[in-house]
Regions:
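Internal, glycine-rich beta/alpha segment that forms the wall or movable "lid"
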Residues: 2-4, 80-194, 229
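Conserved, mostly hydrophobic/aromatic
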Residues: 33, 37, 45, 63, ...
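Alpha-helix-loop-beta-strand connector modules within alpha/beta enzyme cores
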Residues: 53-74, 128-139, 223
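N-terminal beta1-alpha1-beta2 module of alpha/beta enzyme domains
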Residues: 1-66, 173-175
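Active-site beta-loop-alpha junctions enriched in small/polar residues
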Residues: 9-13, 46, 77-79, 107-111, ...
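Glycine-rich, aromatic-flanked loop segments that form ligand/cofactor-binding clefts
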Residues: 224-249
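Hydrophobic faces of well-ordered beta-strands that scaffold small-molecule active sites
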Residues: 6-10, 41-43, 71-75, 102-106, ...
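Active-site-adjacent beta->alpha loops and helix N-cap segments on the catalytic face
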Residues: 52-58, 204-220
Length: 250
């Protein structure tokens, strides 16, 4: 197992208003990332945005078909506005189609515009997110029960009666789940409870603060009697523009 791995983000959006990345760009980018030896390739998620933005799950399906080794996943997918039941089905399918190469980064997102467009109250996002995580865990059936096991779930925001998600993901018991958090105590406790790892962002954290938050997170895991040895972290960094021509970069 590698001590550190490197992933790269698929160029989901265009840099001209109204335009998105083309099919040819997406496919060539994914194949080049695999050729160069990157460990993972990820997509993120917006429904409405100021520029063209490709759909996350559809894009994963496309790159799964043109790659063979590289892991593919989300960083992050908004399971609140998308609905966790639909996400569980779609992500199970991606894991099967990619022969078990999927990792799942989940969060409620921070774009109020996405919530408004989808008719979901923005102020409820964190409570809905915790319930949505419980629904996905249950639908992916980590208790070793038969695939025919029906699920009942009675939450404040999500209610299921006799539900079933078949087929289950390719990976057993399921794809790894990374939970996004800016690093608040409540957020880190949510990561510790529901995640296989923490997906942090370089937007708002320094290396020193990252280590402090990581130590806190491991302590929360221990308090919950959860494994810390296999618990992972990831850091999403800022993108940059590189060219020999200074004017082009600017």
């Amino acid at each position: 197992m590698k001590l550190i791995s490197f992933g790269i983000h698929l160029p989901m959006m265009g840099f001209v208003r109204g335009e998105a990345t083309s099919r040819e760009q997406i496919i060539s980018f994914a194949q080049k990332a695999e050729e160069l030896g990157y460990d993972s390739l990820s997509v993120n998620d917006h429904i409405v945005f100021r520029t063209g933005w490709l759909d996350a799950i559809s894009s994963l399906s496309a790159i799964a078909a043109v790659t063979n080794r590289i892991k593919i996943g989300t960083s992050i997918l908004n399971i609140v506005i998308r609905n966790p039941v639909i996400c569980a089905k779609a992500l199970s399918t991606i894991d099967i189609l990619s022969a078990g190469r999927l990792f799942v980064g989940l969060g409620p997102g921070s774009s109020k515009g996405d919530y408004d467009a989808c008719g979901v109250p923005f102020e409820d996002r964190w409570k809905r997110f915790s319930e949505a995580l419980e629904v996905i865990h249950a639908l992916w059936n980590e208790r070793g029960e038969p695939d025919s096991q029906l699920l009942d779930y009675d939450g404040k925001y999500y209610r299921l009666k006799g539900a079933r998600n078949d087929p289950k993901p390719y990976q057993k018991p399921r794809p790894p789940i990374m939970i996004a958090s800016w690093g608040s105590e409540q957020g880190l406790r949510r990561v510790a409870k529901y995640g296989d790892g923490w997906m942090a962002s370089a937007y708002n954290i320094t290396p020193v603060k990252f280590r402090e938050k990581w130590m806190l997170l491991l302590n929360y895991r221990r308090e919950m009697n959860k494994n810390v040895e296999s618990f992972e972290n990831s850091l999403m960094t800022m993108f940059g523009y590189i060219d020999n021509d200074k004017e082009k970069v600017q």
